[in-house]
Amino acid sequence: MTNIRKSHPLFKIINDSLIDLPAPSNISSWWNFGSLLGICLAIQILTGLFLAMHYTSDTTTAFQSVTHICRDVNYGWILRYLHANGASMFFICLFLHMGRGLYYGSYMYKETWNVGVILLFAVMATAFMGYVLPWGQMSFWGATVITNLLSAIPYIGTNLVEWIWGGFSVDKATLTRFFAFHFLLPFIIFALVLVHLLFLHETGSNNPTGVPSDSDMIPFHPYYTIKDMLGALVMILALLMLVLFSPDLLGDPDNYIPANPLNTPPHIKPEWYFLFAYAILRSIPNKLGGVLALVLSILILILMPLLHTSKQRSMMFRPLSQCMFWLLVADLLTLTWIGGQPVEHPFIIIGQLASILYFLLILVLMPITSIVENHLLKW
């Protein structure tokens, strides 16, 4: 008799995705982040669901309801901080996952990569709307500043912003719809994750060498299930350390002040994981130009397969390209730092140079470096 996991229509899908899936024998710990992202999504959906049971999306009570969750609901404080810091952990895993994809040429699986870029946009939208919900000062002013960027769109901009706001400013209607979308989007993300996996399993995983590994595959279970469990343990430990020892480390103190439309905070800035894009936005003096640069800083990822000029897929054996990659990482860290600084000298010029370097590296320097390497290898 055939094993039920191989014959049952539902179990067969799970079996082919997580148990009997052929996987390259040499994938490193950099391939752990996909499963870690799945765990992050599960944590976010579960903690978010329980938070939504006690949260009220009304401007008069939103801030108080979050305070009530932390003070009066059983283990409400841990739910709230798991959710807030879980988002940070989500983005850490997301950035590392994308970095792995860039380094090892995983973007050559175009469908998987493009769905991944759409996922990134969806996660960023969800995180932004979630940050508005506690209705603190940074929530209110962050929502005002970021939604206001749409007014830079010619002709329809102003109408579009007022349509999103549901009025003439960020108010009750805005908060209610942001809560609705913040609740809905994670389920759309979950559906996109399934599409992401569907495309991945069409081709199979890449591996550090970038060479096809069809001749040397091993079953996903038990080898990579146990490896993923170790990764999950380390990540959950890191998350719990953050939540239990310094839950407000990555947050903004201004968000403990209730939203006040009459009082602007000295430095309006988003959560740390958006700072690199925020720095690119601020480095261009023109409003529309800044918005375009902001969108292109993420959208540029879709061009990665087109910008791949090397004869090799992975950067594993390409030292010059490795230098360019780590320069890009350093540049993104610089942009993240600049995004959190006030708009004054010398931060303005540093931000502008880092923004130029970001686009220059991806569009010009990395493709040229790859061509140089091809010539050095006489390919």
UniProtKB/Swiss-Prot annotation:
Query: What is its membrane topology?
Result: Multi-pass membrane protein
- The UniProt entry lists the main location of this chain as mitochondrion
Q: Which GO terms describe its molecular function?
A: metal ion binding; ubiquinol-cytochrome-c reductase activity
Does ATP-binding show up as a keyword for this record? no
Q: Which UniProt keywords apply?
A: Electron transport, Heme, Iron, Membrane, Metal-binding, Mitochondrion, Mitochondrion inner membrane, Respiratory chain, Transmembrane, Transmembrane helix, Transport, Ubiquinone
Residue sites binding heme b b566 per the record: 97, 196
What PROSITE patterns does this protein map onto?
Answer: CYTB_CTER, CYTB_NTER
Task: Give the record's cofactor note, including how many are bound.
Answer: Binds 2 heme b groups non-covalently.
Span-the-membrane segments of this chain are 33-53, 77-98, 113-133, 178-198, 226-246, 288-308, 320-340, 347-367
Task: Kindly list the cofactors needed.
Answer: heme b
Explain the purpose of this protein. Answer: Component of the ubiquinol-cytochrome c reductase complex (complex III or cytochrome b-c1 complex) that is part of the mitochondrial respiratory chain. The b-c1 complex mediates electron transfer from ubiquinol to cytochrome c. Contributes to the generation of a proton gradient across the mitochondrial membrane that is then used for ATP synthesis.
List other remarks: Heme 1 (or BL or b562) is low-potential and absorbs at about 562 nm, and heme 2 (or BH or b566) is high-potential and absorbs at about 566 nm.
Its protein name is Cytochrome b
